[in-house]
Structure formats: structure tokens, C-alpha cells
Amino acid sequence: IEMPPNGDFARSTGPFIPRKEDLENSALFLHNNTGKKSVLLDWSTVNGLKALESMLSGADIFIEDWDYTYRETTGIGREQFTSCHPELIEICITPFGLDGPYSRWKSAPIVQFALSGIMNIIGDPKSDPLMIPGHHPEYLTGINGCNASVIAPVSYTHLRAHETDS
């Protein structure tokens, strides 16, 4: 589910594949999303939120990336969906979690890359931090989110936990 007007940022990220058809042509977007279906939905509106809740009625796992500030601004609480759908597992992908001392902090890919420990093994320790090209922090986040979505059903079965903060 993508937020209008532009949806996934990768749709407008190059390199672009020259095509005659009026189809997606971002190589990054195609690499990450081939075979997937998507819908544009503005869940910040009352009707959009109702549509999202309706979609979640048949879902096992809901993966979102709404940080604490976004939830506070939109009024989407932590129990918003799991209270209506008690079997739903929500994977919350945020830079620093939804609780704790850093939950309200913003982040950037270079910060996440540094915190992953990978920056410790590249570059010169006496120089500025180096960011390797590509979208590695985002991919690492995706891998962790995927792991959480595989582990969460087992946790839910044994502990009845509804939310995993990745």
C-alpha cells in the first residue's frame, strides 16, 4: 500500500530502463517489486483509514514504517488495528523503536548504516565516515523486517504478542 501522490520513492529513482510501453521503468523499483501488487491509498483520511482496516481484516501480518511522530500526528495508535483484528501481527519498522529514549528521534540511511556496525570495517578511521553506494541500509532493514515477520507468528502462538518492533 503506497501513499499518494507518488507512492514508493523507488518509482522515481534511476537508473531508468528505456521502454516504449507506459510502464514502470525504474530499475530499482522493478528489482524490488517485480511480481508484487500495489495500491495507492491515503490512510491519513477517514475513508482511507477505513479502507486500510478493511484490507487488514483478511491479513495475517501488517508491515508498516510509521514512526512515533507520524503516529502522534495522524492519531493512529499502537492498538489501532490489532484491537479490531486480534489475530493480526503488526511489524513496526522504525529507526529507533516505538518506546524508549530514542523513539522520537529521526534518522537517515548513513546513521542506520553506522549503527549496523558495517562502517566500522570500511574507510579510514581518521577520516569522515564513508557510505557505500546503493541502498544497503534499506535492504538491511528489509531483511530484519522479514526476519521479524517469520519469527512473529511463532512468538504470537506461544506468547500472544501482537506487535513486533523491528
Model-inferred region functions:
Residues 158-166:
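Single conserved hydrophobic/aromatic residue that forms the stacking wall/gate
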Residues 1-155:
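N-terminal helix-loop segment corresponding to the beta1-alpha1 unit
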